[in-house]
Amino acid sequence: MELKGKKAIILGDRDGIPGPALEACVRSAGAEVVFASTECFVUTSAGAMDMENQRRVKELAEKYPKEDLVVILGGAEAEASGLAAETVSNGDPAWAGPLAGVQLGLKAYHIFEPEIKEQIDPNVYEEQVSLMEMVLDVEAIVQEVRSIREKYAAW
């Protein structure tokens, strides 16, 4: 999946990779950021993705062709990252927000995934992400987000 020319929805994590760092990375790869947020994944109610972010993602999926959109995650742990990926592709599993029962089919990638990382300017990645890559469980996060994408993403 090539980032260049895509419209990126950025869902950063206060305890992982924040929105501004993700924005810098995807912009360096040629994507247009259409929405960026930093939330506290572990703070959200009942493990659900932030309600306002769900609303914005839904609006963007209605505004742009879904095949032009990509969601880039910065979650600090696998479960929260997987939950966000599932919400934007298959609907809110907590049935708590605007995406409850709404299957957008959007592709979500974590910034750590090799197919995303290799498209980012190495200097930008080093400055914005590499420190967190050293302290988080990259393998578990990548595996979880990839499995959700392979199961639910349609575009």
From Swiss-Prot:
Keyword 4Fe-4S: no
Record-annotated active site: 43
GO CC aspect terms: glycine reductase complex
GO molecular function, a single term: glycine reductase activity
InterPro entries assigned: GRDA (IPR006812)
Pfam families tied to this protein: GRDA (PF04723)
Enzyme superclass (EC): oxidoreductase
EC number: 1.21.4.2, 1.21.4.3, 1.21.4.4
Keyword Iron-sulfur: no
Superkingdom classification of source: Bacteria
Record's catalysed reaction(s): acetyl phosphate + [thioredoxin]-disulfide + NH4(+) + H2O = [thioredoxin]-dithiol + glycine + phosphate + H(+); acetyl phosphate + methylamine + [thioredoxin]-disulfide + H2O = sarcosine + [thioredoxin]-dithiol + phosphate + H(+); acetyl phosphate + trimethylamine + [thioredoxin]-disulfide + H2O = glycine betaine + [thioredoxin]-dithiol + phosphate + H(+)
The entry's keywords: Oxidoreductase, Selenocysteine
Subunit structure: Monomer. Component of the glycine, sarcosine and betaine reductase complexes, together with components B and C.
Protein family according to the UniProt entry: Belongs to the GrdA family.
Primary role: In the first step of glycine, betaine and sarcosine reductases, the substrate is bound to component PB via a Schiff base intermediate. Then the PB-activated substrate is nucleophilically attacked by the selenol anion of component PA to transform it to a carboxymethylated selenoether and the respective amine. By action of component PC, acetyl phosphate is formed, leaving component PA in its oxidized state. Finally component PA becomes reduced by the thioredoxin system to start a new catalytic cycle of reductive deamination.
Name of the protein: Glycine/sarcosine/betaine reductase complex component A
Taxonomic lineage: Bacteria, Bacillati, Bacillota, Clostridia, Eubacteriales
